[in-house]
Swiss-Prot record:
Part of the DNA-dependent RNA polymerase which catalyzes the transcription of viral DNA into RNA using the four ribonucleoside triphosphates as substrates. Responsible for the transcription of early, intermediate and late genes. DNA-dependent RNA polymerase associates with the early transcription factor (ETF), itself composed of OPG118 and OPG133, thereby allowing the early genes transcription. Late transcription, and probably also intermediate transcription, require newly synthesized RNA polymerase. The DNA-dependent RNA polymerase used for intermediate and late genes expression consists of eight subunits Rpo30/OPG66, Rpo7/OPG90, Rpo22/OPG103, Rpo147/OPG105, Rpo18/OPG119, Rpo19/OPG131, Rpo132/OPG151 and Rpo35/OPG156. The same holoenzyme, with the addition of the transcription-specificity factor OPG109, is used for early gene expression. GO terms for biological process: DNA-templated transcription. The keyword Transcription applies. GO terms for cellular component: DNA-directed RNA polymerase complex; virion component. Induction: Expressed in the early phase of the viral replicative cycle. Expression seems to continue throughout virus infection. GO terms for molecular function: DNA binding; DNA-directed RNA polymerase activity. Its EC number is 2.7.7.6. This is DNA-directed RNA polymerase 19 kDa subunit. It comes from Vaccinia virus (strain Ankara). The gene is OPG131. Residues 1-35 have a biased composition (Acidic residues). It catalyses: RNA(n) + a ribonucleoside 5'-triphosphate = RNA(n+1) + diphosphate.
Length: 164
């Protein structure tokens, strides 16, 4: 039993010393010497939400700019795409599709199919639709200057090969 009393006394002595240390620390530190700044030095920032909104609007602006570039790029036709349109149109004309030209007559049916296809494309009545950047586009959706440039190039090649 005597041992138990010693343990209790020992524990109670430590507690009082610990409490004394806390009191000394509280008395020794003031707000001026503390690591924590006083509340008066804190700045209330009201513009934090505006910074977030500005960043969000900036991202939205960048997204709109990318979409505009993508739309402009989509409107440019490549030589590969125009060759695909011509090939598909030729294939459908061979399978019996009627030419969609403004002056359709018996003479049109006697013309070379390549002439009919080029006439359809130049008039904008070619029924072939291609998918580019997730959009379905007809010949009318593309840049007219680029389309004309590629058609002229293809026609020159056909003339050299004596097909046109």
């Amino acid at each position: 039993m005597a041992d138990t009393d010693d343990i209790i006394d020992y524990e109670s002595d430590d507690l009082t010393e610990y409490e004394d240390d806390e009191e000394e620390e509280e008395d020794g530190e003031s707000l001026e010497t503390s690591d924590i700044d006083p509340k008066s030095s804190y700045k209330i920032v009201e513009s934090a939400s505006t910074h977030i909104e500005d960043a969000h609007s900036n991202l939205k602006h960048i997204g709109n700019h990318i979409s505009a570039l993508k739309r402009r790029y989509t409107r440019r036709i490549s030589l590969f795409e125009i060759a695909g349109i011509i090939a598909e149109s030729y294939n459908l004309l061979q399978r019996g599709r009627l030419p969609l030209v403004s002056e359709f007559s018996d003479e049109t049916m006697k013309q070379n199919m390549l002439h009919v296809i080029i006439q359809e494309i130049e008039e904008g009545s070619c029924p072939i639709v291609i998918e580019k950047n997730g959009e379905l586009l007809s010949v009318n959706d593309f840049d007219k200057d680029g389309l004309k440039f590629h058609l002229d190039y293809i026609i020159k090649i056909w003339k050299l090969q004596k097909r046109y």
